[in-house]
Amino acid sequence: MMRVASCRVAGLLIALAIAWPAAAQFGHPLKGAWSGDWGTTKQNRNRILLELHWDGKAITGTINPGPNAVPLQKATLDPATWAVHLEAEGKDAAGKPVRYVIDGKLENIGAYQRFITGTWIQGDRKGDFKIVRN
């Protein structure tokens, strides 16, 4: 009787040990709010907020949510290399179209505060960026 109870307790502990890492998963690696900056030089930086969603089939999202939000038109993640590609079209202060092309690499994948670094093109300006998941 004692032996059966001990085996049950041991089995329960093993099952919990196996299930615990699965409970710590955060879903799609890009899902969430990301903040950081981009710029053409170290002195010329622009704050950015990126909100990304995963509906089970596609990545969607917005650059700088709010009154001047820019919805993403294309968003991809290559899980083999963790390469991220985002495209959007917004407007500048004069109302003229501005194309966004963002290419980066997802890093620190095992942590909640993972980050993406890479190249940010906004209109005719090109620079680097780093964003961290909040």
Can you annotate each of these PLM segments?
Residues 25-134:
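Central antiparallel beta-sheet cores of small beta-barrel/beta-sandwich binding domains
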Residues 1-11:
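Bacterial N-terminal signal peptides that target proteins for export
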Residues 10-21:
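Bacterial N-terminal signal peptides
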